[in-house]
Each structure stands twice: as C-alpha cells, then as structure tokens.
Design a protein with these regions (language model features):
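Gly/Ser/Thr-enriched, mixed-charge loops and adjacent short helices
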Residues: 47-56, 164-302
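Phosphate-binding and adjacent anionic-ligand microenvironments
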Residues: 303, 307-309, 330-332, 350-537, ...
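Conserved phosphate/anionic-ligand binding catalytic regions in large, soluble enzymes, centered on
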Residues: 52-72, 156-159, 243, 247-259, ...
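Short, Lys/Arg-enriched N-terminal segments with co-localized hydrophobic residues
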Residues: 3-15
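Short Gly/Thr/Asp-enriched flexible loops that form oxyanion-binding sites at enzyme active sites
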Residues: 111-120, 163-170, 256, 318-337, ...
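N-terminal small/polar loop signature for handling phosphorylated ligands or for N-terminal nucleophile
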Residues: 100-163, 261-321
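Glycine-rich phosphate-binding loop plus the immediately following alpha-helix
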Residues: 169-199, 337-360, 365-376, 431
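An N-terminal, well-structured beta->alpha segment
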Residues: 21-116, 123, 206, 211-239, ...
C-alpha cells in the first residue's frame, strides 16, 4: 500500500469518529453531564478518538468500560443500545419473554438498570427488577426463579470507581453463551446508538404491569437456598465468633449480614467507612478483596476489636476475601486458592461425617487455580474438573450435571480470584455462601480446639507447600489490546525453552482444542522441570495480561524464592 492510500484511509477513519463526535455534540442528550464532557474535549483529537474510534464490544461477559460520553464509554445510550440488542434476541426465544435486572452501588448503576427496564418494557418484554441494589448471586437466582429468558446485572465488579458495566445472563442464570452473545452483538450493531432503542417511561411500565419489582418470595427463597447448603447446621450458634465485615461500599451488606445472623453469628462489626453504598469507593480506589489496600480498614478494625475473622466482599458481592487471627494476635490474609482448598477439605470432611456426601461427588475449578485442590479432591474420592477461566465454565459444568439428572453431585466450584459456589441454586460465584461457609468452618475448628490457620498448615504438611501468585501487566489505551495480542503471538512464535534457569518441559496452548479437549482460549501453560507451572493469559475484562505461578517447596521460603526467580524472568518478556 503506497503512502497516499494510507493517508487517505487514516483521514477517512478520523472523519468517521469526528463525525460521530459532532453528532453527539449536536444532539439533545438527556444527560447534561455528557454534553458538558463533549464540549470540554472539542478540538482535542486524542480525547475524541478514545471515546468514538471504537465501540465497547458486547461479549459473553456483556460490556464494561469507563463512564463517560461516546460509544467507547458506559452511558445511558450505550446501555439502551445493548438492551435493545438483547430485547431483539429475547423476542426470538419464546418462553416467558421476561428479563430479571439487578445492580450494585456503582455510579449510575441504578440509572442504567432503570433505562434497561424501560427499553425492555417498550419492546413488550416483562421485567423483574430489584427495588434496591442486590448482588450478582441475587440476579442469577432471580433469573432462574422467574424462569426468565435473560438477566442483566449492572456492575463492573471490582474495577475502579470510573468503570461500570452491563453483564448479561442466559435463562439458566449463567453468563450468556458465546452463540447467544454473538446474536445479541449483531443486533446491537444494527441499532443506532442515539435513536435506535425503543423507550417507555419507567412509571408507565409499572402502570402497565410490564415492570414489576422482585418479590419478597424470591429474596427469601435465595436465603433459604444458601442456608440449605450448610455443612454443619447450627455450629455457629454456640461458637461465639467475633467478626469484622466490610461490603467495600457495595451491595453485600444486607444479604451477607442477613445470612450470617440467620446461622447464629450476632457479633458482627461493620467497617463504618465502607458500610453503605458509595460508587466513589472513597477509602479504596480498587474495591478488590484481592488487594491489601481494600482490606486495610477492616484489618485495623479487627485488631482493635480482637475479631476472629475479617471478611470483605467486592461491590457486586460475588467474591470474598478473608483475614484470620493468628495465635499471636496478628492477622494473616488467606488467598483465594487457599480458601478454595480449605472449603473443599471442610465440605468433604463434614459431608462424609454427616452422611450427606453424594455418590460420585464433583468439584470444579478454573485451570489457573491451585493443583493442590486436585490432590485434596483425590484424597476424598472427589472428581475434580478443571475448566477455562471464567465462572461461566463452572456454571456450564453444573448445567451438564443438571441435564444428566445428577446436579446433586456438585459440591463446590471455585476460582483463585476469590470466587466460590457450594450449591446449584445459582450459576455464578457467590460471596454470600462463601462468607457463610468460611464462618462455619471457623466455628467448627474452634469447637474441636483448632483453627483455620492450623488446618491450613496441616494440609500443607500432608500434601506439600504450594505457593500460588498472580501478577498483572497493564496495557491501557486504544493500543493496549494490540500490544497484548503481539505479546501472545510472540510467545507462540518463539516459545521460551527455559524460565529463570528452569527448563520448560511442556507447553499447553489452550487455543489448540485438540490438545486440551476444551473450547479455545487464549491461555499458555508452561510446565517446568521440578513441577512448577507458569500460566500466561490476557484478562477477559481488563486491558492486562495475567501471569499465574505455582511453585512447590519443602518450606514457604523455598517456594517463594522460586516464584521470584520465575516472575523476574517473565518481566522483560511481557514488558
């Protein structure tokens, strides 16, 4: 291609997004904040390009982006366009022609949820929407409870405050399938972003019976379903557990404390600065229970009160992080992998003791989660299934068991990123049941003169000292995705033969479905001499490449030393 043609093509692209910008600027937008933002960036090509050169792409996880004006930002027009695309798909599905909606505490989450309801109602689709913020598991449950065609959760999970998102669920309460998402995306592309979505006033939708609030019967059924999954019912009532809990200014406060009170935990101190919904997340810019800074206030309060446990749930309350009190009075954070292994061990041990373990039990974990779980599962005679990253794949395994009439075989699903599910009542991770079972586990070990810490050390003593660490490399901006793609392509074209002096003995490329037997995924697994593994994959929701290290040593220090060597070896490759 000669220089003049390249210049003309670039000029055409610039003209397109500048034209889109001018169209938005000249429109009578319902949100004056969007108009103000557009005026401020007038003449600033880079700012305009970031907002209009591309559109947020709808996938199986829906949409997620920075709040603001333009097709590459989260705003009421992007939400309406996405909902119209979803509505077009729902109208082809038959059945109830109903969609369930929930939302978290993020900026404009309630506004986006109501806008989605208005679009659906205008399309003749019935809506069941929560009357107040409720978390991901509540949305998944309502979708199943009302036999809805789909569900919408307005959230950006644990992202910083400037983000929001639109998660779409299928009729089983699991994230939407690839095929369905592709159809919805095609319908979105046919819909003009400013004028293409049908709209009805929310009050008119209520008056016509098209929009209804989720009933108390559904809410109570959720709590009952969670509490029915207790391993040792009643164990918490006499344990005297002292708890500090933080909902991180998100949606977990009401459902988590309700269930904990129901099972007998009354001594719960809420972190006051993080108690109530606040989408600005003023005390933790990254409201992520994996990050120490998000837990800092909770840990400080735990030290003051002498709490046995500190729990924190992310804004949409599908993930929970914990800290445990050690014998010397200090607090230790427990990783998602460690909690997953502890819960697996506790559930197996308890259900065998109580005679409630199903025949041929099944547990499911993501392939990036610790291999220690496989060893623990085998010890109890549990089939451990490893699936691609993303809880929808765990939900898919539950659906397969359900289709075979064997859903009772499912005992636990978990991801290393602090997501747990111990029952088939929903199809996404659930911090409510995670919190309940963690507390129940602590109560049980106290009742036998032990502790979560002691049990974890006993597991390591029996199976080996596994260390699991996750690092992230961020690639912001429009060029970020291209950089990530080039890095992954380079790793495939020129695979490393060693990392940090450790020979690579096997490479598994999850894009090769014949090799893995799983759907294609952009994941590379390196197995090293001595048993360590390194996994590299781009995040599915954020502009970053994640690396997962699993090392095994006789001591923690030995495992940590190997992890550091491997992490240092990867840095220049992913820089």
């Amino acid at each position: 291609m000669n220089y003049s043609i390249r210049v003309k093509k670039r000029e055409k692209v610039i003209t397109m997004y500048i034209d889109d910008y001018k169209r938005w600027l000249g429109a009578e937008l319902e949100d004056p904040a969007l108009t103000d933002e557009l005026k401020k960036i007038e003449g600033r090509e880079g700012e305009i390009k970031e907002r209009f050169a591309v559109a947020l792409k709808f996938g199986t996880a829906g949409l997620r982006g920075i709040l603001g004006a333009g097709s590459n930002r989260m705003n009421i027009y992007v939400v309406r366009q996405a909902t119209q695309g979803l509505a077009n798909w729902v109208k082809t599905q038959g059945g109830s022609r109903l969609v369930a909606i929930s939302y978290d505490s993020r900026i404009n989450s309630d506004v986006f949820a109501r806008n989605a309801a208005c679009v659906l109602a205008a399309n003749g689709i019935h809506v069941r929407i929560y009357d107040a913020l409720m978390p991901v598991p509540a949305l998944s449950f309502a979708t199943r409870y009302y036999k809805a065609n789909a569900g919408i959760m307005i959230t950006a999970s644990h992202n910083p405050a400037k983000y929001n998102g639109f998660k779409a669920y299928g009729p089983d309460g699991c994230q939407m399938t690839d095929d369905a998402a592709a159809v919805v995306y095609a319908e979105i592309q046919k819909t003009d972003i400013l004028t293409g979505a049908k709209m009805m006033a929310f009050e008119d939708g209520i008056a016509q019976g098209l929009i209804e609030y989720v009933g108390e019967d559904c809410k109570e059924a959720l709590y009952s379903a969670i509490e029915a999954c207790a391993v040792r019912p009643g164990i918490c009532k006499t344990a005297g557990l002292k708890l500090v809990y933080s909902p991180l200014n998100g949606s977990g406060l009401v459902p988590v404390t309700r269930v904990l009170h129901d099972i007998g935990i009354d001594d719960i101190t809420i972190v006051p600065e993080q108690q109530y919904p606040d989408g600005n997340f003023p005390t933790c810019p990254y409201p992520n229970p994996e990050i120490f800074e998000a837990l800092r206030l909770g840990l400080e309060l735990a030290e003051k009160t002498g709490a046995d446990l500190m729990l924190a749930t992310d804004p949409d309350a599908d993930r929970v992080g914990i800290a445990i009190r050690c014998p010397d009075g200090s607090y230790e954070l427990v990783s998602g992998n460690e909690v997953g292994v502890l819960l697996l061990d506790y559930i197996c041990q308890g259900r065998m003791e109580k005679g409630t373990m199903p025949k041929r039990p099944v547990a499911v974990k993501s392939l990036v989660s610790t291999p220690l779980a496989d060893i623990v599962a085998a010890n109890y005679g549990v089939e451990m299934r490893s699936v691609l990253t993303g809880f929808k794949w765990i939900g898919d395994q539950i659906a397969k068991l359900e289709a075979a009439g064997e859903v009772d075989r499912f005992i636990l699903g978990f991801e290393e990123s602090y997501g747990y599910l111990a029952g088939p009542y929903v199809r996404d991770k659930d911090a409510i049941i995670g919190s309940m079972l963690i507390c129940e586990m602590a109560a049980y070990y106290r009742s036998i003169g032990s502790s979560i810490k002691a049990r974890l050390e006993a597991i390591y003593a029996k199976y080996g000292r596994y260390l699991n660490k996750v690092n992230s490399f961020e690639f912001p901006g429009l060029s970020g995705m291209d950089k990530m793609a080039k890095i992954m392509a380079s790793l495939r074209k020129t695979p490393p033969v060693e990392l940090g002096g450790y020979k690579v003995v096997k490479i598994t490329d999850y894009q090769d479905t014949a090799q893995t037997g799983l759907p294609a995924a952009n994941v590379l697994v390196y197995r090293l001499e001595g048993g360590a593994t390194v996994i590299v994959r781009p995040s599915g929701t954020e502009p970053k490449i994640k690396t997962y290290f699993t090392t095994l040593g006789k001591t923690l220090a030995e495992a940590e030393a190997q992890e550091k060597v491997l992490a240092d070896a990867l840095k220049p490759i992913l820089a």
